[in-house]
Amino acid sequence: MKEFLIYFWGQGDTPEFALFTPAHFAPILAMIAGFLLIRKYADRIRASKHEEKIRYGIAFALICSEMAYYWRLVARPELGPNPVDNLPIAVCVWAAIFGSYMIVGKNQKLFDIIYFWLLSGSLFALLTPTPLTYCGPTRLRYWQFWTEHTFGYIAVFYMIFVHGMRPYPKSMVRSYIALLELTAIAYFTNRLIPGAN
C-alpha cells in the first residue's frame, strides 16, 4: 500500500501525459456531459429538496481539489513544497476558491468575476494542460488538476442553468478589475518574497 501511495502522490521521470489523447479528452467530455445533464434537468434540480446539497457538493469538490495540490506537495517533499514556489496567486486557484463561495452563496458578483476568468484564462489550461506532462491518469495530480478546472465550469454553468445567473456588460468590468487586483497582489508578493513565483 505504501508503494502505491508513493507512486500515486508522485510524478513520473518521463512524460506520462500527452495532449489530444484519450487522457486529455475524457475529462473535457465528462465536463460537457455534466453541462448537458444540468441543462436537461435544471427545473428538477431547482425544485429538488437536495438542490442545496448539490451546490455544497460542487463547492466541496472545488475546495478539496485545490487543497489536494498542497497536500501532495507536503506528502512528497521531493516535489518541492517550498511555499515561495507555490503561492496561491494564480487565476485558476482563485477561480476555484471564488467558485466555491459563489455556488454556496449564489453570489452574482463572484459569478461575474469567475465567468470571464474561466472563459479567458482557464480555457487555455483545459486545451493545453502542461502541468500534467509527468502526471498521467494514474497520478493524484492528474485528478486534482481536472477536478479543479472542470468543476469551476460546472459551478458556473450550474448557476446559469439552475439559478438563471447571466453575465452582463458590467460583469466584464468587474472581472477585469478583480484580475488587476490579483495582478497587483501577485506583483507585490513577488517583490516582497525573494524567489517567489
Kindly label every feature range from the protein language model.
Residues 2-32:
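Hydrophobic transmembrane alpha-helical segments in integral membrane proteins
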Residues 102-160:
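Membrane-proximal helix-loop-helix units in multi-pass membrane proteins
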Residues 42, 67-78, 127-136:
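Juxtamembrane "helix-exit" motif on the non-cytosolic side of transmembrane helices
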Residues 48-103:
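A glycine-rich, hydrophobic loop/mini-helix early in the fold
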Residues 35-40, 98-99, 151-170:
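Alpha-helical transmembrane segments in multipass membrane proteins, preferentially the mid-helix core
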Residues 62-71, 118-130, 179-188:
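Aromatic-anchored segments of alpha-helical transmembrane domains
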